[in-house]
Amino acid sequence: MERQGLDLGLSLGLGLTTAATWPAAGFCLNSGMAEQEVIRRDDVVAATAAEDERFACSPGSPVSSGSGKRGSGSGSGDEVDDAGCDVGGGGARKKLRLSKDQAAVLEECFKTHHTLTPKQKVALAKSLNLRPRQVEVWFQNRRARTKLKQTEVDCEHLKRWCDQLADDNRRLHKELAELRALKATPTPPAAAPPLTTLTMCLSCKRVANAGVPSPAAAIFPGHPQFLCGFRDHAGAASSSYGGASSGLAKAVRAAR
């Protein structure tokens, strides 16, 4: 009985001991795995950094393309960046001067296509004895200059249009102020109709209304006295002519 109890106690003690030692062993195992993971991760980071540096130094990499794009804004059309890169950071960038023939061929190609496919880029670089990267940089510079010129033209056009709109706005404001001033001033009263003028006929001794002319005045409106005198003279002449004719008739009868 005592032996069984001793064995049971021993087994229980061993079980507790092993149970107590398992977390420590697991912790040590986890620590070792974590250290190995950290070391492995550092190796991967170092290898990735080295690969990135080599990739950045290659002529056709996007990183060097971006650096060429940043440096291309101040370059002329006949210069391209000859991207030379040193892993240690001591490399200097130099510019390659293009000949007139090379620049002319590139300009003609740019008139046809503003962007080139990789095959076109390689073929054009081979025909001009250049590297594909140099052709790519030249096209990037040319597109940037074209966009800048178009922006300047658009800005000048918008500036003129803005000045014209400002002049029209000032003119409309002036016309509106004049219309408001005319509306605010009181209107003068309506003018009275002209008075009717009367003229005196000296021969007829009658008062004639100048607004309603007589038939004789309608024929000769400017000579009322002449008409009256003409009528008087005509009457006198007719009476004298009639008297003379009657006397002549009497003399003829007496002779008979």
From Swiss-Prot:
Compositionally biased region (Low complexity): 58-67
Keywords recorded for this protein, A-Z: DNA-binding, Homeobox, Nucleus, Transcription, Transcription regulation
Residue ranges: DNA binding: 91-150
InterPro entries registered for this protein in UniProt: HD, HD-ZIP_Homeobox_LZ_Class_II, Homeobox_CS, Homeodomain-like_sf, Leu_zip_homeo
A UniProt-annotated Pfam family: HALZ
Recorded GO CC terms: nucleus
Spans annotated as Disordered: 56-86
Gene3D superfamilies found in the cross-reference section: Homeodomain-like
Region annotated Leucine-zipper, chain positions: 149-193
Compartmental location: Nucleus
Tissue specificity statement from the Swiss-Prot or TrEMBL entry: Expressed in seedlings, roots, stems and panicles.
Entry-linked SUPFAM superfamilies: Homeodomain-like
Top-level taxon of the source organism: Eukaryota
GO molecular function, one term: DNA-binding transcription factor activity, RNA polymerase II-specific
Function: Probable transcription factor.
Membership in a protein family: Belongs to the HD-ZIP homeobox family. Class II subfamily.
UniProt-recorded name of the protein: Homeobox-leucine zipper protein HOX28
